[in-house]
Amino acid sequence: MKKVKEAEKRNIKRKKRIRDRIGFGVADRPRVTVFKSNKYFYVQVIDDMAGHTLASVSTIEKDLKLNKNIDDVKKLGEVLAKRLKDKNISRLIFDRNGYKYHGLIASFATSLREAGIDV
């Protein structure tokens, strides 16, 4: 149990270090943050100054019917890019939320860039 608590503390410190480095999202450049569970992949676009979620997308949405794999996460990036373009948002700050930048995280960020969002 002690190892689990120590790992949790390390993860929290890593998240804080990353968040301090990237800064806060503002209205003209909000922060996009990702979360991976064992089954789903969640993404939120957050305006930290106002404390509002501007857009969100996840693999759990019924109309998308996606799984947590690289191809579906790329589709998720395209869907989020379309929603952001509808709201006239073209620049984001990418918050990987303590995860390594590879696999699902990297493919999601790449799909956002390919869709025309400046990350």
From Swiss-Prot:
InterPro entries: Ribosomal_uL18_bac-type (IPR004389), Ribosomal_uL18_bac/euk (IPR005484). Keywords: Ribonucleoprotein, Ribosomal protein, RNA-binding, rRNA-binding. It holds the Pfam family Ribosomal_L18p. The keyword rRNA-binding applies. One of its GO terms (molecular function) is structural constituent of ribosome. Part of the 50S ribosomal subunit; part of the 5S rRNA/L5/L18/L25 subcomplex. Contacts the 5S and 23S rRNAs. This is one of the proteins that bind and probably mediate the attachment of the 5S RNA into the large ribosomal subunit, where it forms part of the central protuberance. Belongs to the universal ribosomal protein uL18 family. This is Large ribosomal subunit protein uL18. It comes from Borrelia hermsii (strain HS1 / DAH). The gene is rplR.
